[in-house]
Amino acid sequence: MRKSLSLFSIFILIFLGLVIPFITLTAFRPLNEEQYTLKQESSTGKGINETDFINTMFLRSSFFENWSETNYFINPTLKTSKNLLFNDKWYLDFLQDSYSTGVVYDKPNEVFLNYYQQWHSLKNRYMVEKFYDVKKENFLNDLIDFIYAFAVKYKMFNVSKEIVKNVDRYKENHYPRVKLNQDNWKLIDDIENVDKYKWEDETYIGITKIWKNKEWNWIIEDWKLHPPFSNVYLSSYKAIYRWTGVGKPQLPTIDKNTGEITDWNSYQQTRVKEFIDLSLYSVLLENTRVQQGGSADYENPNKVGTKRIIFDFETVDELDVKNIKKAIYRMILTVDEANLIISGSLELNNINNDDLSFNFSFMRTGMGEVFNFNGSIYSSLNSKDLKYYQQFSGQFDLSKFLQSFFASALVPVFQNRSSFIENGYIDNLQYDTVLVNFFALKLQNFNNILLSENINDKLQFDKLLNSMFKISQKFYTNYLRTIFDLENNTYVQGYNKKYGLLVNNGFKIYPRYFYFSDKYKQLDIKLYSAFKNRFYTINNYGSVFNYDFSVANNYNISLNSGYVFGGDLQNKYGLQYKKIEEQKIGYNVFELQAQKENDMYRYYDFNFGIYNWQEINNGGLFPDKQWWQVQYITPKGWWDFGAHIKNAVIWIVNTIPGVKQVNELASGVGKVFETVYSFFSQIFEVWKFNPALYSTITNIFLLIIFMKFVRLI
């Protein structure tokens, strides 16, 4: 009886071992094939296409199940009725929201534009022309330079302080850059020694008396038009001035009865001060827009819709206390009304030192993807004289350029990378460097995007590019603060914002760190998402708050929430956050409500990991078109029960929306598989069981474990 029961048990086990794989194979595999067949969208004339994007970066995002206007892409692993469109609009919006440090719309504010358009009458009304000739071809800079020079001369300290604070070129050097008219007219003290032979080369004026209309009148004579006959007549001049400025001078006016210059008097000073008080805010606002990449072409102000997407990295060497070294690395993409890139630039500026810098600009040649570019390598000392060492030009393909840029540019290099990959989180984040290569800093990669037939001397061009790459490499060797660092200042839509992001570079897909800092009225708001892990302790940025992300339409912040501040601040601001320990919906949106001010902050973030796609593809880790999935295992045959059951678990992870802690689930399942197989391998190694029986029993155990996981979902 026992023998027959034992045989019956073995028969049941074998039967289940044969049937279950067919069930899992039939139930899961066809669904998977239907789910992950993506339609290739044509992108002719639209810029980067789907293949380019997939090759550009590896990312995975939670899906906004409740679609919002700020959601620009979806997770292909989740069921949705939305079409997958990989076009320029989608791609640029993603870059703008995920990486950019600012967006500037290329349109000046109406008040400042009115100053430009009405300048002919304004300069007379406010008597600006008595002090300085503001040139319209360089209107913004010339106007700021005049206001600063006037403020310094007439001790308008609040005005000069605001300009130093907001205008980059005055932060390092506080000296006025232009002379006022009265400073350009130098009084000649020793009249007898005036060099009359330079009258044709320089401008002299003399104040003298003439008999006119039966009375003596004081007049100004321009010696180029009315030179004195000899030195004998010089004694008849009350005063002689020499023009020391640039350009054609404007003769001052005098009182015909006294001979005194009436320009620059107290009344005229008052009128100019009125203009400065009226215009300073608009002028500085416009300057900020231009500093962030906006156009100063006021002759063509109707470029409605054009904008500049800015990727700005500012570094400061704080170790050099006496002479703080500062460098700015900036990329700007200019986009037209059709959301197509029409031009762009990359620039490394080293300020207050003589390190080499470079500028690389490009512009669309027509409707295609061919762009002309120009580059130069230069140095400057104290932001004054520029010295160019090398210059080059050529053409490249924009799509390939963006692909190379964003595929290889953002590659964090962690010191404890292996530990991070194993555990899926960073308890103490420590890394040697974060490599941000705007050109991928590999000459071979950059040469791949060039249209080489347009390069006359390829060898010389390679040499020039290598020089630029070395400069850029030195920049990132010396400095650590990049987009991945905290406290990155940027100016967006009228207020200062700080933004930092730490991304993972391991097998785990979901990053667990996000940092955001903003100024709300007088309150400094800081949001963190770190799952109670210590956050960037190297520089001691403080404790970590655990805020939640949510995508539900019925999101109620009063549920499972806490107050950011207690006591009086709680009553004043009413700022709440949702507790992450009790609510783990998704990783897309977090909200912060300022209830007392009847205002709400809602920031959207895309949860993604960044990989170097070239390394992944070369290693064969993620085949093309399956970059978003946990990869399926290819069974050796219908009898490969382990592969079928593993594929069933992978299907759950890849397909079902709302899987809680999907990364931990995937990690946990993998560890269980590893543990179970290890356990039975040791047993069967000792007892030498039949391999077929070993496989069957193992897979039944795995199926039981799998069902346990399913019940937890």
From Swiss-Prot:
Family the entry assigns: Belongs to the plectrovirus ORF1 family.
GO CC term (a single one): membrane
Topology in membrane: Single-pass membrane protein
Entry annotated with the keyword Zinc-finger: no
Lineage, highest ranks first: Viruses, Monodnaviria, Loebvirae, Hofneiviricota, Faserviricetes
Domain of life: Viruses
TM regions (residue ranges): 686-706
Disulfide bonds: none
Protein name per UniProt: Uncharacterized protein ORF1
Keywords for this protein: Host membrane, Membrane, Transmembrane, Transmembrane helix
Location in the cell: Host membrane
Listed Pfam families: DUF3688
